[in-house]
C-alpha cells in the first residue's frame, strides 16, 4: 500500500485498519470465521439514501459485534471513526452507472459505494479470504504484518545508505561554503540526497501506519535516522533561492517533489528547479554563494527571527564570517552577548567543517 502514504486520506484509512485497532481485530475475526462482509466507514444523507432494509443500531463498536453482524446478509455501516455501529444487515444500492473494474457482486458494490459517498468501504471476500479497501477511486488489499515488515526493513536499509551519503555531501558543502568555493553541482548534489531521503522516509512512514502496534520499533528507527532532514531541506533551499521572491521556497520544494525518479538523478534537472546554473541549468560548475540560513541554524539557542534578521542584514555567509562582534551588534535583536556567541559559533563551525573535510 505504499501508494497511500503521500495522501492524508489514505494515511487515515491505513491507521483505521492497522494491527492493534478494534476494526482490524474485527476484520481478522471475520476472515477466521470464513465469512464475508461489506463495511462502510462513514454515514451521511448520501449513505442513508443508498441503504435499503436492515435495522438501525447506533451502539458502541467492538470487534466481536462486527464479527457477529457479519454473519447476516447485508452491509454494516459504522461512523467515520469506527467507534459506533450505526446500521446493519442493510442492502447497499449505489448508482449502477458508476464504473467499476471488479467482477464480484460484493466488490462491485463496495467500489461504487466508495465512489458515490466519498467514504472508505471495506469488502471482505469469503472465497478468496482477502480484505480490500476502496477509497478515493482506488483499491488496496490488506497484507499480513510479516510481508509489510519485510518490505519496510528493505526500505530502512536503503534509507541508511541514503542518509550516510547525505551526511557526506552535506559535510562537503559546509566546508566549501566556508572556503567560498561552492558550485551549482555541490548544491544540487545535497538537494538530490535530501529529496531521496525524504521520499524513502515517507514510504517507511506509510509502513509504520499500516503496521499499527507492530510498527513501533520501525517508527523509532525512522525517527532516529531522519532527525532534522526536513528542516535541513528547507534551509539548503533557502540559502540558494531568490530572496526577492516570497513564494520561491515553496515553489522549489513543490518542484522537487514533482520530479520523477529519472529526473531526480539528473543534477541538471534539479538545478533547473532551483533556478541555478543558467537558463538550462547545465552550468553546474558555476559559482554560487549561500545566504547563511543553514550555517546559522547550527548555532545553539539562536532564534529563527534573529537568523532571518542577520541574513537580511549581511546578505551572504561570507560577510557574516568576516564580521566582527561590533558588526554583528548592528543587527536588530543582537546584543553584545549574543554577538559574541554568534562570532564564536561561526568560528567553531568553520574550523570543524574544514577538519571534517581534510582529516
Curated annotation (Swiss-Prot):
Query: Which cofactors must be present for this protein to function?
Result: Mg(2+)
Output the Gene3D superfamilies linked to this UniProt entry.
5' to 3' exonuclease, C-terminal subdomain, DNA integrity scanning linker region, DNA integrity scanning protein, DisA, N-terminal domain
Any GO molecular function: DNA binding
Q: Where does ATP bind?
A: 74, 92, 105-109
Q: What keyword terms does UniProt attach to this protein?
A: ATP-binding, DNA damage, DNA repair, DNA-binding, Magnesium, Nucleotide-binding, Nucleotidyltransferase, Transferase
List the EC numbers from the record: 2.7.7.85
Q: Which family does it belong to?
A: Belongs to the DisA family.
Which PANTHER family does the entry mention? DIADENYLATE CYCLASE, DNA INTEGRITY SCANNING PROTEIN DISA
Query: How does the annotation summarize its subunit structure?
Result: Homooctamer.
Function, in words: Participates in a DNA-damage check-point. DisA forms globular foci that rapidly scan along the chromosomes searching for lesions. Also has diadenylate cyclase activity, catalyzing the condensation of 2 ATP molecules into cyclic di-AMP (c-di-AMP). c-di-AMP likely acts as a signaling molecule that may couple DNA integrity with a cellular process.
The identity of this protein, by name, is DNA integrity scanning protein DisA
**Which organism is this entry from?**
Beutenbergia cavernae (strain ATCC BAA-8 / DSM 12333 / CCUG 43141 / JCM 11478 / NBRC 16432 / NCIMB 13614 / HKI 0122)
Name of the encoding gene = disA
